[in-house]
Design a protein with these regions (language model features):
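Terminal or standalone catalytic/regulatory effector modules within metabolic enzymes
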Residues: 2-162
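N-terminal positioning helix adjacent to the helix-turn-helix/winged-helix DNA-binding module
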Residues: 167-175
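Basic, amphipathic alpha-helical hairpins
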Residues: 175-187
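Basic/polar phosphate-binding segments, predominantly the helix-turn-helix DNA-binding elements
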Residues: 185, 189-200
Length: 200
């Protein structure tokens, strides 16, 4: 991958990618061409978002960075807000909030794929959940977009996402967004009025 496509995998990711390639090689009973190796890599780590995608993502300064992420899951689009230390952390927190999951951002690496003003960047994101690593890769001229795509692929691999046919109740997500957007003056009474709940 490095020699033919300038892809320099993080050390911690190499064994898993090698295993995926070896599995195909063993099944086909032959050595794979560089292009075939790249296609296996792309299928497993770049174009692999079977459960959810992100339609859009916007950021603003708010006690760090706030991400407004539009998540497309099960054919439904939901906007989720969350804060983080940086853009990737903020987007990661929208996923944790929406799906009700927990994981750690364990590895982040990036490098240019080619030289020049219009060169693409590649980002590698590794997350850890229950002691196991999950990897995703993104490529884009915008390194932030590449990073977010890599995170989306990694989170799609979590077993909890596959099992989670319906995400948390949309009404709960709406309440969390309302509280976050009005955190300075939110009260139980205002939440009750906004969401037609019985008075506390």
């Amino acid at each position: 991958l490095k020699q033919n496509f300038s892809i320099s995998l993080p050390q911690a990711m190499r064994e898993e990618v090698g295993y995926a390639v070896k599995q195909v090689s063993d099944e086909e009973h032959k050595e794979l061409s560089p292009q075939w190796v790249y296609e296996i890599f792309e299928e497993n780590y770049v174009n692999n978002t079977p459960y959810f995608t992100v339609e859009s993502c916007h950021f603003k300064q708010n006690d760090g960075i706030m991400a407004e992420t539009e998540i497309n899951f099960g054919g439904k689009k939901t906007i989720v807000d969350a804060n983080g230390n940086g853009r990737l952390d903020a987007v990661s927190n929208t996923f944790k909030q929406f799906f009700g999951i927990s994981y750690e951002l364990s590895t982040y690496e990036e490098h240019a794929l080619s030289h020049g003003s219009s060169s693409k960047a590649i980002a590698y994101v590794g997350i850890t959940c229950d002691g196991k690593n999950y990897w995703g890769v993104g490529m884009d001229e915008d390194i932030i977009k590449a990073s977010i795509h890599a995170l989306i692929v990694a989170v799609n691999k979590l077993p909890q996402i596959a099992q989670n046919e319906s995400a948390q109740d949309e009404r709960l997500t709406s309440m969390l967004n309302y509280i976050q957007n009005n955190y300075q003056d939110v009260t139980l009474e205002s939440i009750a009025a906004q969401f037609h709940l019985s008075e506390p």
